[in-house]
């Protein structure tokens, strides 16, 4: 072997040994750490607290890096390399994963003149040139914060890739879960998640924001990008602006390419709550430092029925922003904004060849040659609008608006509009008075309006401290004077709005927010204003209240001496209504007409009243005249157990000069409720001759009641009723009002006669479409110092389907002696009770709760001992045959009752519980045997079984009760 070959072989051995040692050194964690720190110290300048792994897969923790005034920090960076690619032209990093990456732009961007003070374009291109390709296949970051002095931009869940080759930077398909934009007026310490509390409030920004926006255009119109950028596909699922939720965007899709200072927008799609846009076009960064753009857009806005509009933006940005936008079909806009003058003079004109806005299917707003103009400065401008507006189904009208304003305030100088009813002969608004023949029904509005808008707080306020509408409309003089305030947090406030319709006066006041509370009234003594030859006086009030989504209303209409052409005359009118807009009809209705004349026909009085409850339905009508008297009462009853609804003519009383016809308790209509479990499908029982059957029952029902009942009943009743029903259809409308007075009850038991008197009974029922509303009052005595009455309401909503119930009963020192007439188990009952009963749920699954107080209660019977023994299984059965006179006396007591339904095996079961308590009880077995005691008893029922738990405490002993699972 020659000397040359010997040295060559030794050199190769040495080189391979050295290469192996270096490779072994880099493969070890300690060796790679020393190698990274050495190269980092001389070349990179990256600071890190911990290094782990080797040159193929390594992880850096808590890094800090500064370059060109930009600070980069991260909690950790994990990099996986492709070792083979290090020896090729293209270097590949398989994966880069960062955690809590923060990029801070610390230095301000200063305005520069690239023509004189910046590097030449060619020099920059030579400087920024990627001689070796670098490919980052997968880039993932859980959280990225981009910090500037005035903005914080948070990116969550970023998946991307990057390729640098020659002078091109390519972003591989990129996905971002969410982006949040907020102010950076305070330090952000932690980045936890998208719900983290590092978003803060901002100061008012009006002038500064405009300065920054216009300065941006004036600076960056002179800027060019020295490299080519290719964005293959970008998708962002959410973009949010904190404290400006109205700008939130649901989804963004983007694809673009920047090559040789030409930005080609392949696709931009933006989806928001209020609009959707699709855009494509080109932006040219010219060598004379001007920017030319042409962008085609397709936009749809929700408030105008999502109708698509095609827009074309085409113009040049230089020292001034001159812009033009042409709708490919219907409109164009052009204007001018200075980018160099701090006063920012502006001039914007909007012209629409044809405006077409379908607000709804039957309401369309349109206008030809629509013009809008805004001139002046940002903080001192003038705007005007003059156009003819057409609304479907209404006359066209001309409107002219002129106003002045600044950033915070808009003052409307004048709003002028008038309708016309003949064909338009010209499009020139200047000559409109001369060239258009229209009816001069002119209405003018003059006033002031102040608009306050703070985007940081998401609040907008509109104040109208004074406005006045006056003039003629349809040859009728009108005048409206008042004030109006709108605050986003509190809604609309109306201190008072007064209006004059001729000589008729009225007013409106109240507020509208989540809840509405409006009060209005009108006093009309000039009825000829509304209809010719109409005379009289009308007073009316209307109140609207409760939630805006489900408002309720009540109204009262009073009329005096209403006369129309001496044909129709009402001496007195009273109409009251109460309702809820969800039900679309009055819940309560009462109408009272007195001294009615129609031509030669005369009526002394007419009363109509109606109301409902979930079991009994009533409707009343009463008409009285000298020769004719009609009283009509219609009742209905629902028996849920057997699934039958029954309609009964409670009373028909017709009196004429020829005689009187009276009928009571005549069954008229029957419904059978199929499937007693769900009670949803209601069908009428087939009866070929239902009307004949009803007439036949009239002859016997009253006499049958008199013969069988031991109770004599006497009263003065009056009712008003309305009933609407179509054959083979559900009842759609029923209203009834029943008023009874001087009600006398008489019952004879064992040669003893009992009397009871009830002073008044009022019942109001209203059933319409699918809801059943009732209200009632029973007064025991008019002369009593205490209230002494029962009142309440019981309503059924969605009667033919869900049958939801809601009701309350109020007991106010009401005497229970009337119970003697409706039961046969006790000889005598006396006392008073008070409290309330609540009803909820549905008819099939009711929920009832009651709280009843007893006072001076007295029960006498020879069966009390028998009923008490039912709860004690251990007593002999024959002891119940002992009959002695027994009395129970209770000075005070209380009973709590709860009833619920439980669904078991698709069957609804009722369970209830009664808790009784009294400290002052006495039982009298014989005239001389009286035992005083106190008691607390809890009776529980479920699945036909009872539990009784409690005690009876006497003077010398106490008796505990614990009986369970017994049957009656």
Swiss-Prot record:
Principal cellular location given in the protein's record: membrane
Subcellular localization, as worded in the UniProt entry: Membrane
Superkingdom classification of source: Bacteria
Membrane-spanning intervals of the chain: 12-32
Record's keyword terms, sorted: Membrane, Transmembrane, Transmembrane helix
One cellular-component annotation, GO: membrane
Membrane topology: Single-pass membrane protein
Family: To E.coli YtfN.
Name of the protein described by the UniProt record: Uncharacterized protein BUsg_080
Species classification: Bacteria, Pseudomonadati, Pseudomonadota, Gammaproteobacteria, Enterobacterales
């Amino acid at each position: 072997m020659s000397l040359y070959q010997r040295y060559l072989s030794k050199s190769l051995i040495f080189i391979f040994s050295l290469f192996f040692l270096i490779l072994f050194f880099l493969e070890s964690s300690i060796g790679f750490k020393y190698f990274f720190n050495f190269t980092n110290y001389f070349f990179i300048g990256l600071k890190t607290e911990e290094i782990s792994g080797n040159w193929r897969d390594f992880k850096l923790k808590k890094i800090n890096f500064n370059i060109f005034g930009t600070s980069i920090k991260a909690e950790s960076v994990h990099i996986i390399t492709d070792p083979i690619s290090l020896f090729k032209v293209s270097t590949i990093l398989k994966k880069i994963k960062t955690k809590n990456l923060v990029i801070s732009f610390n230095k301000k961007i200063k305005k520069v003149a690239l023509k004189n003070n910046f590097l030449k374009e060619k020099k920059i291109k030579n400087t920024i040139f990627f001689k070796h390709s670098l490919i980052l296949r997968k880039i993932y970051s859980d959280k990225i914060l981009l910090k500037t002095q005035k903005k914080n931009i948070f990116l969550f869940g970023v998946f991307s890739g990057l390729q640098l080759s020659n002078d091109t930077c390519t972003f591989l398909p990129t996905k971002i879960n969410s982006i949040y934009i907020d102010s950076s007026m305070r330090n952000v310490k932690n980045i936890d998640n998208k719900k983290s509390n590092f978003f803060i409030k901002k100061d008012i920004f009006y002038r500064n924001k405009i300065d920054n926006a216009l300065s941006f255009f004036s600076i960056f119109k002179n800027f060019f990008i020295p490299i080519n950028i290719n964005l293959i596909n970008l998708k962002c699922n959410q973009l949010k602006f904190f404290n400006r939720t109205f700008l939130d965007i649901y989804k963004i899709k983007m694809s673009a390419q920047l090559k040789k200072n030409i930005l080609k927008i392949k696709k931009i799609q933006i989806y928001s709550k209020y609009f959707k846009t699709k855009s494509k076009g080109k932006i040219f960064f010219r060598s004379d430092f001007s920017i030319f753009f042409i962008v085609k857009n397709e936009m749809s806005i929700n408030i105008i029925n999502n109708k698509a509009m095609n827009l074309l933006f085409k113009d040049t940005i230089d020292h001034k922003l001159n812009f033009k936008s042409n709708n490919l079909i219907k409109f164009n806009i052009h204007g001018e904004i200075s980018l160099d003058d701090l006063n920012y003079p502006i001039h914007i004109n909007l012209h629409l060849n044809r405006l077409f806005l379908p607000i709804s299917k039957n309401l369309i707003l349109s206008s030809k040659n629509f013009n809008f103009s805004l001139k002046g400065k940002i903080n001192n401008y003038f705007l005007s609008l003059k156009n003819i507006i057409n609304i479907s189904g209404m006359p066209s009208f001309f409107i002219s608006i002129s106003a002045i304003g600044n950033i915070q305030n808009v003052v409307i100088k004048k709003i002028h509009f008038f309708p016309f009813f003949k064909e338009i002969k010209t499009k020139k608004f200047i000559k409109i008075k001369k060239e258009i023949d229209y009816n001069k029904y002119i209405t003018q509005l003059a006033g002031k309006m102040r608009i306050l808008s703070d985007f940081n707080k998401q609040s907008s306020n509109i104040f109208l401290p004074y406005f006045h509408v006056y003039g003629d409309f349809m040859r009728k003089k009108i005048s409206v004077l008042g004030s109006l305030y709108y605050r986003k947090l509190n809604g609309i406030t109306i201190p008072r709005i007064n209006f004059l319709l001729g000589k008729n006066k009225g007013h409106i006041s109240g507020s509208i927010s989540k809840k509405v509370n409006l009060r209005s009234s009108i006093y009309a003594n000039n009825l000829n204003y509304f209809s010719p030859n109409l005379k009289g006086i009308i007073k009316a009030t209307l109140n609207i209240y409760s939630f805006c989504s489900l408002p309720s209303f009540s109204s009262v209409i009073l009329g005096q001496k209403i006369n129309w052409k001496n044909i129709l005359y009402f001496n007195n009118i009273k109409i009251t209504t109460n309702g809820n807009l969800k039900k679309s009809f009055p819940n309560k209705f009462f109408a009272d007409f007195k001294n009615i004349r129609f031509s030669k026909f005369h009526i002394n009085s007419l009363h109509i009243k109606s109301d409902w409850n979930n079991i009994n339905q009533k409707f009343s009508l009463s008409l009285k005249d000298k020769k004719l008297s009609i009283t009509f009462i219609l009742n209905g009853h629902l028996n849920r157990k057997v699934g039958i609804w029954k309609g009964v003519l409670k009373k028909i009383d017709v009196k004429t000069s020829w005689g009187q016809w009276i009928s009571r308790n005549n069954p008229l209509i029957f419904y059978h409720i199929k499937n007693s479990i769900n009670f949803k499908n209601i069908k009428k029982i087939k009866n070929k001759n239902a009307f004949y059957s009803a007439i036949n029952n009239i002859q016997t029902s009253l006499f049958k009641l008199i013969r069988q009942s031991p109770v004599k009943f006497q009263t003065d009743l009056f009712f008003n009723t309305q009933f609407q029903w179509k054959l083979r259809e559900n009842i759609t409308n029923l209203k009834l009002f029943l008023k009874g007075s001087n009600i006398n009850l008489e019952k004879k038991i064992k040669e003893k006669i009992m009397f009871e008197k009830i002073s008044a009974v009022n019942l109001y029922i209203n059933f319409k479409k699918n809801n059943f509303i009732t209200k009632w009052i029973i007064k025991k005595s008019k002369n009593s110092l205490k209230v002494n009455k029962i009142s309440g309401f019981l309503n059924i909503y969605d009667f033919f389907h869900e049958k939801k119930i809601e009701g309350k009963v109020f007991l106010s020192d009401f005497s229970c002696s009337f119970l003697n007439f409706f039961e046969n188990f006790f000889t005598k009952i006396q006392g008073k009770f008070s409290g309330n009963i609540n009803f909820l749920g549905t008819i099939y699954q009711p929920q009832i709760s009651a709280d009843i107080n007893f006072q001076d209660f007295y029960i006498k019977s020879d069966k009390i001992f028998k009923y008490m023994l039912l709860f004690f299984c251990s007593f002999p059965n024959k002891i119940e045959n002992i009959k002695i006179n027994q009395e129970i006396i209770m000075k005070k007591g209380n009973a709590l009752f709860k009833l619920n339904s439980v669904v078991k095996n698709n069957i609804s079961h009722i369970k209830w519980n009664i808790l009784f308590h009294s400290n002052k009880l006495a039982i009298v077995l014989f005239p001389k045997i009286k035992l005083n005691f106190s008691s607390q008893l809890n009776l529980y029922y479920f699945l036909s079984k009872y539990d009784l738990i409690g005690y009876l405490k006497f003077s010398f002993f106490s008796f505990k009760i614990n009986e369970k699972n017994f049957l009656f």
